[in-house]
Amino acid sequence: MPSQMEHAMETMMFTFHKFAGDKGYLTKEDLRVLMEKEFPGFLENQKDPLAVDKIMKDLDQCRDGKVGFQSFFSLIAGLTIACNDYFVVHMKQKGKK
């Protein structure tokens, strides 16, 4: 039986491939659909309607309109770090009360 971390890794891999399909990469449209389905709260809180376009530009390092798994994982890592930073600040504030 996989551990929670192994399950989390498996979920990230399966999610990427679910949206990438057989081609093995995400297009901007694939990324938009993935973000809408898997990160609806993140997109709802964005004040910029071009958020997905900007994310795609940041992730598409080769400028070929494709986002591979490594770039996708860097997005997940960045979002996780931001969430952790918020969590740490929130917990410190909660502890001061």
Curated annotation (Swiss-Prot):
Q: Which InterPro entries match?
A: EF-hand-dom_pair, S100-A10, S100/CaBP7/8-like_CS, S100_Ca-bd_sub
Keyword Nucleotide-binding included in the entry's annotation: no
Spell out which residues are annotated as carrying N6-acetyllysine: K23, K28, K37, K54, K57
Show the PROSITE patterns listed in the entry: S100_CABP
Crosslink Glycyl lysine isopeptide (Lys-Gly) (interchain with G-Cter in SUMO2): position given as K37
**Ubl conjugation as UniProt keyword:** yes
Gene Ontology biological process terms in this record: membrane raft assembly; mRNA transcription by RNA polymerase II; positive regulation of exocytosis; positive regulation of focal adhesion assembly; positive regulation of GTPase activity; positive regulation of plasma membrane repair; positive regulation of plasminogen activation; positive regulation of stress fiber assembly
GO cellular-component term (any): cell surface
Recall the GO molecular function terms of this protein's record. calcium ion binding; calcium-dependent protein binding; protein homodimerization activity; transmembrane transporter binding
Query: CDD domains of this UniProt entry?
Result: S-100A10 (cd05024)
Keywords from UniProt, A to Z, are: Acetylation, Isopeptide bond, Ubl conjugation
Chain spans, region Ancestral calcium site: 60-71
Q: What does this protein do?
A: Because S100A10 induces the dimerization of ANXA2/p36, it may function as a regulator of protein phosphorylation in that the ANXA2 monomer is the preferred target (in vitro) of tyrosine-specific kinase.
Q: How does it assemble?
A: Heterotetramer containing 2 light chains of S100A10/p11 and 2 heavy chains of ANXA2/p36. Interacts with SCN10A. Interacts with TASOR.
Also noted in the record is: Does not appear to bind calcium. Contains 2 ancestral calcium site related to EF-hand domains that have lost their ability to bind calcium.
Q: What is this protein called?
A: Protein S100-A10
Question: Taxonomic classification, please?
Answer: Eukaryota, Metazoa, Chordata, Craniata, Vertebrata
Q: Which gene encodes it?
A: S100A10
